[in-house]
C-alpha cells in the first residue's frame, strides 16, 4: 500500500464559516446538555438584533457602488475606477418597496440628505509608503481584479454582520497581505478598506448601535488583513509508511473544534464532574451515567481527589468489564483494534503495518495489553498527556489521511459500534486488488443500458463506500459489438469497418429522410421527442430536409439544442452528463481518467458547446461515422452486456415454461429415472478407487553420490514447489547456488525444499499477490502435500505468518513431526491423498484440481469440528 493511496469516499464539505447561533448550539450539543440561561440569552440577543443586522446589510449593499467608488478614488488616480466594476450574474435584486425604503434610510444616514457633501471628504489616514496608483499604468486587467476584490471585501462584511460572527472575515482575509503585495500594494488596500469603513459608518450617523456593529466587523477585516499569514498545521510522522499531514490554518478557524477537557487541581466539583462525563462519552461513546444510570464510583472518587490522573482513569475504563462487554466480546479482533483506536487515540488506523502491530498484541496478549500499548504510546503522550481527556481528531482538528478517508469518517459516526465488520483491514486489502471494469470515478456514473434516457443507479441502494484505486493510465475493458479482432485498440485502422450485428442508419440518395430523422432523434435523445419539444427543433429539421447540413452537423445541432441540454446537461452532475453524452455521440463509454479529464478541461474552460464540438469533430467520430451516418453503439460495458443476457435468458425461460405442457405426477413416477445403457453399466462395474494412487511416483535419494539421480530429484523438487518446470529460470542466481550445493551432497532433500521455499521467486509468486489464508493453502500443498486440515490449523499458521513471516512458517512445516514421519530427509513432498478413502481428500482434491494463478477463491475446509488442533 503506497503513501499516495487515496480512499476517495465519502464527500466531506469543509465548513467555511461560523454563525453566532451555531456556535452556541454546537457547544451544548457536544457537551450533551440543554442550553443554559446565558446561552439562551445570547441567542435571544442575536435573534432580536436580526432585523437590525439585515437592515444594515441592505443599506450597505444598496450603497455598495458609492462605498467602492470612494475607496477606489482614494487609491487610484488618472481615471474612473468604478467603470471597471463587474457585478456577478447571480446578484440579488431588491423589490421596488425594499429599494425605496432602503434608499430613504440610506439617504437620511448620510447627514442631512446631502450625499455629495461628504463625497470628497477623506477621513482615513494613509500609512507609511502609500502612493496613489495610476489607472493607465496599472492596466485594465489589474483594475478589474482590484475593484472586484474591494467588492468582495464589502460583501464579506455584510455576510459576517448577518451571521453575527467574524470567522468568515478571518477565513477569507487572513494572510492576503503577502499575496496583494506581490500584485500591487498592500498599503493601498489598507487605505481602501479604511475608507470603506468610514463611508459605511457615515451611512448610519443617527444610529449609534448600528455604527458599533459596522465598526466591529470592519476593524476585524482590517486587522486580519494586516496580520501575517499563518502557516499550515503540519503533523510530523515517525514512520516512513505513514502519510504526511498538513492542514491550512483557515480550516481550523472555520471548523467546529472538539472540546478539550483538562483535569486541574483548582477545578470545582461541577467542573470535575464534566471532565468525568467527557471521559465516559469518549470511551463508551455515550454518557453512561445519564443514559443507563451506570458509573464507576471508586474510580471517579480517585480522579476527583487527584489520586490518579485522567490517563490512568481512561486506562481503567478500557480495562473495565463494561468496556469488554460492549466493545470486545461481540466483535472480531480486527474490529476491536479499530474501535480501540477511536476510543483511546481519537482517530482510525493509519496503515496496514500499524494494524498488524496492534492486532498481534491483541491476539497474543489480550485486550488489556492492547489498551496499555495504545495509552503508553508516544503519540498519546504528545496529544493528551496525563491530564487531557482524549477527543475525536476529525476534520478541522488536524489533517486527515486520504488513504483511510472513508473508513475514518465512518468510524467517527454514532453507529460505529453497531458495525461488526472490520473496515480498515478490508480497505487496506482493496488497495492490492486490480481495479474492476467500471467507471474510473465511481460505478454510479455509468448509465443503465436502457432506452429511457439518462438513468443511473441510486447511491442509496446497496451503498458501498469501499474505494477503487484507478491509476492515471488505467483503461477499463469494453465489449465490442462485432468481432473482437476489429476493436479500435487492437486494430486502429478498422475504425471505418462497422460491426456486423448492428443496424446502421446511413444517408444516401435512395434513403428516406424521415427514417434518418427518426434514427437521429432516437440516437441523440434516447427516445422519440414529444410534439412540444419538436416545435423548437423544427427549423433545424427543415434545414436538414433541404440538405443544407450533413447528418454529422444535424446530430451536433441536436446535441446543442435547449431540449437536449435541459434533459442531459443542466439537471445532471457534470461527470454523469459527460459520460452519457459521450455514449450517445461516440457510441462507447469513456476509457479512463485521461480521456474524461480532457473533457473536464474542455467543459470548464470553453463550455458545453465546445465539448459537443470536440466529440462531433473528433477523429474517432469522423472515422467511424463520417458525415452521413447516424452514430450507433459500438462498445458496451461488461455489466451492460451481462444484464442484457440475463434479461434475454429470463424472457426465454418464461416463454419456454409457458409453452411446456404439464405432465401429471403419476406419469412422472412411472418413468425410470435413467436408462440402463451399456456404457452406464460399464461405468458402474469399474467404479471404486481409481488407479491414481498406484500410479504416483515418489522421488527419493538413496545415494548422494549419484549426480544423475540427484539432478532428477532437484527438478522434481522445483516442480513440486512451483507447480511447473522452471528450468529456464535457474541458469543463474540463487537457484544455481542451491543446485550446486545439492549436487555436491552438502544439503539433503529436506534442506533443499527449505531453501527453495525461502527463495525470492517463491515469495514473489505465492506470497505477495495473495492473502494470508491462501498463502497457507499453497504452503501446505507444496510442503506437506495436502490441503489444510481445519480452521484451527489455518489460525495457527496465520498467527505464525503475521508475526514471524513466510520463512519461519515454512520452517515450522518442514520441521514438523508430520513432515519428518511422511517424507523424512530424503523424499520430495508429493500429493498424499490422490484418491478415496482419505480423511482430507475433498479439500486436497479441490486444491489440486483448480488453476492456481487464475483462481483467487479460498478453499474452505469441510470439517466443522476442531478436534485435530495443531
Swiss-Prot record:
Its EC number is 4.-.-.-. Its main location: plastid. It holds the Pfam family PBS_linker_poly. GO terms for molecular function: lyase activity. Residues 241-421, 482-665, 679-856 form the PBS-linker domain. One of its GO terms (biological process) is photosynthesis. (2R,3E)-phycocyanobilin binds at residue 184. CDD domains: PBP_PBS-LCM. GO terms for cellular component: chloroplast thylakoid membrane; phycobilisome. InterPro entries: Globin-like_sf (IPR009050), PBS_linker_dom (IPR001297), PBS_linker_sf (IPR038255), Phycobilisome_asu/bsu (IPR012128), Phycobilisome_asu/bsu_sf (IPR038719). Contains one covalently linked bilin chromophore. This protein autochromophorylates (Potential). It is a peripheral membrane protein. It is found in: Plastid, Chloroplast thylakoid membrane. Signal peptide: none annotated. PROSITE patterns: PBS_LINKER (PS51445). Keywords: Antenna complex, Bile pigment, Chloroplast, Chromophore, Electron transport, Lyase, Membrane, Photosynthesis, Phycobilisome, Plastid, Repeat, Thylakoid, Transport. Belongs to the phycobilisome linker protein family. This protein is postulated to act both as terminal energy acceptor and as a linker polypeptide that stabilizes the phycobilisome architecture. May have intrinsic bilin lyase activity. This is Phycobiliprotein ApcE. It comes from Cyanidium caldarium.
